[in-house]
């Protein structure tokens, strides 16, 4: 791969994490972990590819994200992490705000927002090799952000095998998480 796009993510993927030394997941976390990993490995547009984890602060969402990130990156896969706020993005390895990652306009219009990512850009190239998108604080994101990111991924990923312009988020597995009790 050429250019400087995604160097940060690729460097992170190259680091070996001591996955086995991490504490175990509980039963509910393990079920979600298994479903998400199966979706990433399966690559089938017919397999479920959109997931949501809900729980209050301290319930283990961030721990589950970290476990998934370390496991998939240890397999050489690219995992992108976004959150609505910069604070939440900083809590996860390589996390960025959804506005920054997908170049969404600020302020975000209520309808018709688009990601400012061209088909030949480095960001588009990074999205094409991404295996999983983790989106924290999802309940706090406006609908326009979901629509813009989904359209962007549908456009960028449409020519890839096992991806589909008709699928939400272009068929890329996406794990949403958050706490509906914290909606502004």
Protein language model regions, located:
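Conserved ATP-binding/catalytic motifs of P-loop helicase motor domains
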Residues: 1-184
